[in-house]
Amino acid sequence: MTPPGGAARVAAVPPATAPRASVSVPVRGPLPSTEDLAATQTSYDTVAGSYAALLEDELDARPVDRGLLAAFAETATTAGLGPVGDLGCGPGRVTGHLASLGVDAFGVDLSPGMVAEARRRHPDLRFEVGSILDLDLPDGYLGGALLWYSTVHTPPAQLPEVFAEVHRVLAPGAPLITAFKVGDRQVHLQHAYGHNLSLQVYWTPMELVTDLLDQAGLVIDARMVCEPAPHEKQPQGYVMAHRPA
């Protein structure tokens, strides 16, 4: 799900062969408690309708996002290794976009309210309640996985667990694309989308994300950082990877 703050659009693409800087932020810090996860779920249940209405047409003004999603869709459909999971799908906005590109896509989200909104808006697609930490999917089931700002409420210390689970459910050769906030900070939101809520939001260094994906056994294919748009405060990061065959 896209968190409060949106996504930036001015692309800066480092060469694929450029060496990576060393990771400046170790994977440390507390893991989320049961109460933290419940607060995230409840918050998105509360804002589901407002969130879906506000972001319904967001991709129309996001050519970079559409281009990256098109590249991912082409990779997944060409490989033809199975259905594509939009993991942390929110109200199904990106799931529906992938389906419009010919992808056999379905969505999973922690929030029952978001899943209900997704089913209402996209009755022809499948959406299920579930956690990206423990997906109810067989090993190697997915022909592609999307983590579109799905980890912004996940502390860095828990990212290895998320990426290991994604590796488990991806078929050998299947692609992954992830989008996230780039940086080294966290904030606690108490109001967004016209509602009171409780959400912890994390910014993560690009080098940390790519290193952790690599450690999970995934091969990095491309990475990109977009500078903040005028109304935004942080860069956005995108990584495409795949599980090796």
Which residues are covered by each model-predicted region?
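Conserved class I S-adenosyl-L-methionine
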Residues: 25-79, 184
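Class I SAM-dependent methyltransferase SAM/SAH-binding core
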Residues: 82-87, 91-134
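A short acidic, Gly/Pro-enriched loop at the edge of an enzyme's catalytic core
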Residues: 133-145
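A short glycine-rich, Lys/Arg-flanked "PGG" loop and its adjoining helix->strand segment in the class I
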Residues: 160-172
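Conserved beta-strand signature within the Rossmann-like core of class I S-adenosyl-L-methionine
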Residues: 173-180
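Short, glycine-/aromatic-enriched active-site segment of Class I SAM-dependent methyltransferases
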Residues: 182-200
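Short alpha-helix
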Residues: 201-216
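Core SAM-dependent methyltransferase catalytic element
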Residues: 228-245
